[in-house]
Structures are given as structure tokens and as C-alpha cells.
Curated annotation (Swiss-Prot):
Amino-acid biosynthesis as UniProt keyword: no
The UniProt record lists the keyword DNA damage: yes
Alphabetical keyword list: ATP-binding, DNA damage, DNA repair, DNA-binding, Nucleotide-binding
Molecular function in Gene Ontology: ATP binding; ATP-dependent DNA damage sensor activity; damaged DNA binding; mismatched DNA binding
Name by which UniProt lists this protein: DNA mismatch repair protein MutS
């Protein structure tokens, strides 16, 4: 996502501007590349170019208000109460928005003089990676801000989820940046502007999506970065973070600089960086991630993805944790087993699991509530969310810890979660929970300034102020009734922050209030399109008395809110740990629930090079097939890069529509599930950990870069052949199909040989080039698999069974018939096929040709070129023959001599 194209940033001459417009010009000068949401009463107004852009993007009216230097001022506005929806749309369109708030109410400004202007300031700059409001976020999805830095050839990717406080650092090789960013899926990525001159890195950033935000390179320099990171965390040294590298500090420094600019000095409650290396998680490049539809289907929707198929979580935090695990499968079998132990425990304790999931539904999103409170954007509902979450944790700690089964105690991962949730071990959390339970009322507003959220009886002085305020409100109701009776006009007494209390009548009914004698009582204040507003001396006096009582009550409520907010922020770390613990319990229980529903089993994950799946199924396809009422056909797959318990490379053949692509994806998905710590839909799975997963299944044109489908296919194939290791898993579908038949066959043949001989990885190679089946007899660790189909009464029936051995034909004409190709075309295709097959019959087999003979690489010289072998005696004798100068008799004698040499 990139910001909409716009002309160069416009500069403004503030000479002669009104005091309010001078404020706008000052804010615009500070943030020239952002739209300024300028608060004026109940609206956010936009002026000049901002008004034109916002009106076009949001579909709102653009008008004019006043003049500046003799020219009308373009203006557009959105109501304050609906601002989140408009902000969300602008951010999705790629705009940056600076929110300029009123820092005082008009009454306070008037105390400084009748002509004083309300103070305003930028309270935040909204960008895609810095969203925290529920209305702007997907509750079940992460929203990350990432940064990339490179130092001395080493790359680092840092990511922060501002809405939860999570921070991560990855130290990787430069060519692995794309895989890490694809796993993180950031909404916004910061990068030093000098790095964008690297075409490869720039293209990698583009492929990974999100807004790319260039930053001045100086911001990623080591010394400046270290200073900013220390300031961000409020520490004097970074030693406590475990010896961060220069690249990691540079990436974190970019994030710190961006947060300083966008959060207007407010420090978020961030956790210490979690550090990971390239060797800690399975590498999955963007193309593979897309083709396997891990968290999004090809159309961009969550529905139809692997995540959607297995997600049974009941909390927002649990949903985000599950998505993160699927995006970054682990490489350490011990860490994988720890996750699987937690899932297995809930599989074995079904009754407890069901009760736990029911209780979890009452937990709020504590992590995001805490972040908003820390940034000064939270409200009473966020305190209520903390209360509900801590109360839920307290219940779960007793429920799981007291499961009463001494023979099957909770595994280590669940024990750790329970400790984070046990109030007796977290004295501060216990105290905060007690305060919130007694202090918060039942109906909580979104904003602290709305009042009404402190429970009665908690603060006696607040109860007294409320009583006076509420008595005054009854007086207002009585005054309204009397004014209606005296005037004969159906009016209402209303209130807003600008006018205070006022009398409002519809425009059609207000005329008597302008006429004697009523005009002596009713003083005109404001005329709107459909209403007219007035005041009276009595109402103004009452307004002052109510305001004083209401102000006192609200001030006391806000003070109580600030006390609780400060207490919560001071306890940020244990609250974050408690939120993480709830998410872990939710994920483990949810995966157990899915495992039971799907008939999934616990995989065995080790450090071998094996891949042994028995009766495996594709979870997404199986769910779709079951919805249609059809059975799903499971299949086996056995690979072993060491060649001990299975083939290293399986050539997969079979008709179109027989299920080759599904079979390939199915086995890749099994690996992702297993290494993420999930059960797998199969009878059994033994998996040697996979370091990199590559998929070349389907491709499309990249017209913007002048790349055809075939070129894209070759680019992806090149990446696989240069990066796959013996511990990798590769799935390839129809390599070479986008070019001429023999070109494609030659490329497919050579790629298969390279995977077997050079990469030596586990690989599934689906193809319609049946000639590749002969590799089974020519290479040591190749097997053939075919997806079966049979003809029945002239129709083709797909069995979706993977069987040993190659397919005998592709049945392309029959598939064309099934697709609805006109019968005449099908008949003609059959006729042409018969002719081609009869003409190409030859006693010579394809694998007898030198091109397709199995390649055994010989010795290489110092330049890497093959060393030419010395000519044989037969070759030398053949080279000495003067064919043109020989008589028939001499030629016959030479032939006998050559034959004799061959026998020696």
C-alpha cells in the first residue's frame, strides 16, 4: 500500500491569517506530509489542500469558510463522534493523518480574555503501523510496524505491535529479509532512504506489502539509534536486552524515531525485545506463503485459508497468537513438543477444556486495553477490560491448577501460564483487581470525560457532588416544562460543550420567540438549518450552578480514572504476561478442540530428514468437501532426504483435476502445522524439521516489471535451486509448462536432477511430462507417484488416490469435455491427438537420447568448467580418417579396424 499520488507539499503564507488559521499553519508546517484533523468544537476540520484530498477520498462535501489573503479558504469536516470511521478509511487509502486537538475548553480560554483562542496541539500522527483503537483494528489480527536496517552486511528486522506492546528482533542474512517480513505481514515498514537504492531490497519490500515509509538514514546510525532506544524504554543501558547487534539497534532506532514523531512524546508500554535468529523459525518466502494460503486465500480473504480452517480460539489475543504461530513455524523439536504437550493435555481433558473455553469468552483484550491506557487514549471501558481479564485469569488459575488429576498435571507451558494468572503470586495485580471491582460502575463510557463510571459509595465527596448535579438536572426538566407552558412553543433544553445549556426550537416553530413579549425572555444565540437556539437569564444562571457541580463531579471521576490508569501502567509487565498466558491457554484449548473435530493426531517431530505421512488430508479442502457432503480421500507420502526410508524426490503425475496440486499443498501444510505445534489431519506423521519451505505452484504475470508467467516461474525456480538445503521441503507443480514442449521438458528434467543431486532436499515434483518418470530408474533416490483416474462408460472418474508408479496418460481431452468444451472441438482434439500419437511412435526411447541421459557431473578445472577427458584409441583412429580421400575398399578396411578397437 502506498500513499495516493499528490502534488508537491504546498507551502502557506501565514501573513494576515486569523489567530485560528495561524494555529492551523503552525501545525501544517510541523507535519507538511500529513492531513491535519483540526478540532473545532464537535468537528474535525480540514483546510486548503487537505480539504480537497479528504473530500475526494471520503466522499464528503467540500465548502469554503472565510478568506485568507483575499481568497476563500477551502474546508471539509467530519463529526468528532464519527472520526474513527473516517480515519480508518484514510489510513487504508495510504494517507497519514495528524490529529490536532483542543487542549482546553472555550470557557478556560475565555478566562485569559474574550479574544483568546483555544489552545490546540498535535496529540498524535496516525499511520498504518501505529493504530491502537479497536475501531481501527482487526481484533483477531496483528497490526505491526516494522523496520529494516543493514550493518556490515548483516540485516535486522525489528517489529512492534503498538496495540499490544510486543517487540521482536530478527537478525538475518540480507536475502532472508523478505521471508521474515512476509511472516510478520507489517502494515508499515520503515527503511533508511539510502537502502531503497538497492533494487533487490526495494522489490522485496514491495512484494511484502504494507506502506513503505522511507526514513532519513541518519536515524538508523548506531549512536543516535542507541540513544533513542534507551529513551523509548527509559533505561540507561541496553545490556539487559542481551547484546543487541548494530543492525538490531539500527532497526529499533528507526522504530523509536517514528514513535517519537507519531505519539507526541507519549511512551508506549513496550515489552523487552524478543530476539530470534534466522535459524529459529521456518523460512517461507512470500510466493510460497501466498500459494499455500496460510492466513489469507488467494483473493485476500481470511475465509478459505488454513488459519480460518483450524481457528477455534475464543479470545482476540488467542486468535492473534495462533496466526503468529502459523506464520512462523519453529525449528527446535523441543520447543515444538512443548506446544504439542499443551494441546495433548487439553485433548485428554475434554470436560475441563469445555469449561475453560466458556470462561475465556469473558476475557477482554487486556494487551490492547493496556496499550491505549499507556498512550493516553484509553477510557473507562479499557479499565473494565483489564478487570474482566484479570478476573478471568483468576478463575482459570483455580480451574486448571485444581484439575485434580495427580497422574496428569498440566505440562510446563500451561504451568507457566498459570503462574502468570495466579493473583497470590502477583500482589500488584491482586490489588488492582480489587480496586477495579469495587470502584468501577456497571455502565462504562468510552471516554473518561463522559463521567458516570465510578461506582456509588466509593468516594463520598463524589457522591455529594453528583447529588447536587442531579438535583439541578431535575430543575432543568422543570424549567423546560414551564417555558413550554408560558410560550406555547414545543421547545427543548439541550446542552453542548460550546453553548452550555440552551433552548432549542425547530425553525418553523421559533417565530413567536422573536416577537414581543417573548423576545424579552428568550435571547437569540444561534440559527441552524432546521433549529434556532436561545437562552434566558434564568437558564444562564442555572447553567453556571450546574456546571460547577458537574465540573466538580467530573473532575473527581477523572482523578479516580487517572489513579487507576497510572496503577495499571505501572503494572504493565505482569498485565502483559497475564494477557499472554490467557492467549496460550486459549490457543492450546482451541487446537485441541479442532484436533477432536478434525480427527487430527499428534505429529512426531525430530531432527531426521524424513517425511512420513500416513492417510493425510488437506484441512481446508477436506472441510469444503465435507460441506458438500462428499468424502475426502486421504493419501500417504513418504520422503527422506537421506534416502534411507523413502525417496528424496517423488515425481507426481496424473490427469488434470486429479488432485496433484492439492496433494502437493497438503504435504507442505502438514509440515507447517506440525512445526507450529498443531496436531495434523492424518493417521500419523513423522517429520524431520524443515528449515525452508518452497512452493512453486501456479504463477501469474508481473506486467508492471515486464515479466511473463514463464519468466515469473523461472525466477521462483531459480530461488529454490539456489537456496534449498538438504533440510528443505520443495513442492513444484508443472515446471516448464509455459514454453515450447521440448524446452519445458528439458528445463523440468534438469531441475529434477539438480534437486536430487545438488540440493539433495525432500521434494514433490508434479508434472505432465511423463518422460520424467524414467528418472526413477536413472537416479538413486527418485520414486514415482500418480493420482489415479479411470474411464467409465466414456466418462473420466477421478479417484484422488496417490498410488506408486507413473500415470499412463494425462486425459487432457476428457478433462476438456468435462469443462464444457463444445463436442465438435473435443472430437477434433481427439482426432488430432490420435494422429500425433501415431506419428511419434518410435523404437527409440526418450531416455536413450543423450539430452535426457542422467547427468553425472565429472571433475571440474580451476575455473569450475568440466575437465575434458583424453580421447580414446577409437576416437583418435576415427579422427585420423580422411573420409573424402578413401576408396571403398579402404573405407571397408577402416571400419573393420574400428570394430576391432571397440572390442579391445
Amino acid at each position: 500500500m502506498n500513499a495516493p499520488a499528490s502534488p508537491a507539499v504546498q507551502t502557506y503564507d501565514a501573513t494576515g491569517a486569523t489567530p485560528v488559521m495561524q494555529q492551523f499553519f503552525e501545525m501544517k508546517a510541523r507535519h507538511p506530509d500529513a492531513l491535519i484533523f483540526f478540532r473545532m468544537g464537535d468537528f474535525y476540520e480540514l483546510f486548503f489542500d487537505d480539504a480537497y484530498k479528504a473530500a475526494a477520498a471520503l466522499g464528503i462535501s467540500q465548502t469554503f469558510r472565510g478568506t485568507h489573503n483575499g481568497q476563500p479558504i477551502p474546508m471539509a469536516g467530519v463529526p468528532q463522534h464519527a472520526a474513527e470511521a473516517y480515519l480508518s478509511k484514510l489510513i487504508r487509502l495510504g494517507f497519514k493523518v495528524a490529529v490536532c486537538e483542543q487542549m482546553e475548553d472555550p470557557a478556560e480560554a475565555r478566562k485569559r480574555g474574550s479574544k483568546s483562542v483555544v489552545r490546540r496541539d498535535i496529540v498524535r500522527v496516525v499511520t498504518p503501523g501505529t493504530l491502537t483503537e479497536d475501531g481501527l483494528l482487526d481484533a483477531r489480527g496483528a497490526n505491526r510496524l516494522a523496520a529494516v536496517a543493514i550493518r556490515a552486511g548483516q540485516a535486522a528486522v525489528a517489529a512492534v505491535e503498538l496495540s499490544t506492546g510486543e517487540v521482536e528482533c530478527f537478525l538475518v542474512a540480507k536475502d532472508a529479509v523478505g521471508a521474515i517480513l512476509a511472516a510478520l505481514a507489517p502494515s508499515e515498514t520503515l527503511v533508511a532512504d539510502r537502502l531503497l537504492s538497492d533494487d533487490l531490497l526495494a522489490q522485496t519490500l514491495k512484494i511484502c506489502g504494507g506502506l513503505i515509509q522511507p526514513m532519513p538514514s541518519a536515524l538508523s546510525e548506531p549512536q543516535a539509534s542507541e540513544t533513542r532506544v534507551k529513551r523509548l524504554y527509559g533505561v540507561d543501558t541496553l545490556d539487559g536486552f542481551g547484546g543487541l547487534s548494530a543492525a538490531e539497534i539500527g532497526a529499533l532506532g528507526l522504530i523509536a524515531a517514528h514513535l517519537e514523531m507519531t505519539q507526541a512524546g507519549k511512551l508506549p508500554a513496550l515489552r523487552a525485545p524478543r530476539r530470534a535468529a534466522e535459524a529459529d523459525v521456518m523460512s517461507i518466502d512470500p510466493a510460497t506463503r501466498s500459494s499455500l494460503e496460510i492466513d489469507r486465500a488467494q483473493n485476500g480473504d481470511r475465509s478459505g485459508s488454513l488459519l480460518a480452517a483450524i481457528d477455534r480460539t475464543v479470545t482476540a489475543g488467542g486468535a492473534r497468537m495462533l496466526a503468529s504461530r502459523l506464520a512462523r513455524p519453529l525449528l527446535d523439536p523441543h520447543a515444538i513438543d512443548a506446544r504439542l504437550d499443551a494441546v495433548e493435555w487439553f485433548v485428554d481433558h475434554r470436560g475441563l477444556r469445555e469449561r475453560l473455553r466458556e470462561v475465556l469468552k469473558g476475557a477482554g483484550d487486556m494487551a490492547r486495553a493496556l496499550s491505549r491506557l499507556a498512550l493516553g487514549r484509553g477510557g473507562p471501558r479499557d479499565l473494565g477490560c483489564l478487570k474482566d481479564g484479570l478476573k478471568t485469569g483468576e478463575k482459570l488459575a483455580g480451574m486448571v491448577g485444581g484439575s485434580g488429576d495427580p497422574l496428569s498435571p498440566p505440562p510446563a507451558q500451561l504451568e507457566g501460564a498459570l503462574k502468570a494468572l495466579t493473583p497470590s503470586l502477583q500482589e500488584g495485580l491482586s490489588r488492582l483487581l480489587a480496586q477495579l471491582e469495587t470502584g468501577l460502575g456497571p455502565d462504562l463510557p468510552a471516554l473518561a470525560r463522559d463521567g458516570g463510571y465510578v461506582a456509588a459509595g466509593v468516594r463520598p465527596e463524589l457522591d455529594q457532588a453528583r447529588a447536587l448535579r442531579d438535583d439541578s438536572r431535575r430543575v432543568v426538566a422543570a424549567l423546560e416544562s414551564r417555558l413550554i407552558q408560558e410560550s406555547g412553543v414545543p421547545l427543548k433544553i439541550r446542552h453542548n460543550g460550546v453553548l452550555g445549556y440552551f433552548v432549542e426550537a425547530t425553525a418553523g416553530k421559533a417565530d413567536p420567540l422573536f416577537q414581543p413579549p417573548l423576545n424579552a425572555t428568550f435571547i437569540h444565540r444561534q440559527t441552524l438549518a432546521n433549529q434556532v437556539r436561545f437562552t434566558t437569564v434564568e437558564l444562564a444562571d442555572l447553567d453556571a450552578r450546574i456546571a460547577q457541580a458537574a465540573e466538580r463531579a467530573l473532575a473527581m471521576e477523572v482523578a479516580a480514572f487517572e489513579d487507576w490508569r497510572a496503577e495499571a501502567v505501572a503494572l504493565a509487565e505482569p498485565i502483559q504476561l497475564a494477557a499472554e498466558a490467557l492467549a496460550k491457554l486459549d490457543v492450546a484449548a482451541a487446537l485441541a478442540e479442532w484436533a477432536e473435530d478434525a480427527g487430527a493426531v499428534r505429529p512426531s517431530v525430530d531432527k531426521s530428514l524424513a517425511f512420513e505421512a500416513r492417510a493425510a488430508r488437506h484441512p481446508v479442502v477436506e472441510a469444503a468437501v465435507k460441506r458438500a457432503g462428499d468424502p475426502y480421500t486421504p493419501n500417504d507420502c513418504c520422503l527422506d532426504a537421506a534416502g534411507e526410508r523413502g525417496a528424496r524426490l517423488s515425481i507426481v503425475t496424473g490427469p488434470n483435476m486429479a488432485g496433484k496440486s492439492t496433494f502437493l499443498r497438503q504435504n507442505a501444510i502438514l509440515a507447517i502445522l506440525a512445526q507450529s505445534g498443531c496436531y495434523v489431519p492424518a493417521k500419523s506423521l513423522r517429520l524431520g524439521v524443515i528449515d525452508r519451505l518452497f512452493s512453486r505452484v501456479g504463477a501469474g504475470d508481473d506486467l508492471a516489471r515486464g515479466r511473463s508467467t514463464f519468466m515469473m516461474e523461472m525466477v521462483e525456480t531459480a530461488a529454490i535451486l539456489t537456496q534449498a538445503s538438504p533440510r528443505s521441503l520443495v513442492i513444484l507443480d508443472e515446471i516448464g509448462r509455459g514454453t515450447a514442449t521440448y524446452d519445458g521438458l528439458a528445463i523440468a528434467w534438469a531441475c529434477a536432477e539438480a534437486l536430487h543431486d545438488t540440493n539433495r532436499c525432500r521434494a514433490l515434483f508434479a508434472t505432465h511430462y511423463h518422460e520424467l518418470a524414467t528418472l526413477e530408474t536413472r537416479l538413486a533416490h527418485v520414486s514415482n507417484l500418480s493420482l489415479r483416474a479411470k474411464e467409465w462408460n466414456g466418462d473420466l472418474v477421478f479417484l484422488h488416490e496417490a498410488a506408486a508408479g507413473p500415470a499412463d496418460r494425462s486425459y487432457g481431452v476428457q478433462v476438456a469435455k468435462l469443462a464444457g468444451v463444445p463436442p465438435a472441438v473435443v472430437a477434433r482434439a481427439k482426432e488430432v491427438l490420435d494422429r500425433l500419437e501415431s506419428k511419434t511412435e518410435s523404437p527409440a526411447r526418450l531416455d536413450d537420447l543423450p539430452l535426457f541421459a542422467s547427468h553425472a557431473p565429472g571433475p571440474l578445472n580451476q575455473f569450475g568448467a568440466p575437465v575434458q577427458a583424453a580421447p580414446s584409441r577409437t576416437d583418435a583412429a576415427l579422427g585420423d580418417l580422411d573420409v573424402d580421400g578413401m576408396s571403398p575398399r579402404e573405407a571397408l578396411d577402416a571400419l573393420y579396424r574400428l570394430k576391432a578397437l571397440l572390442k579391445t
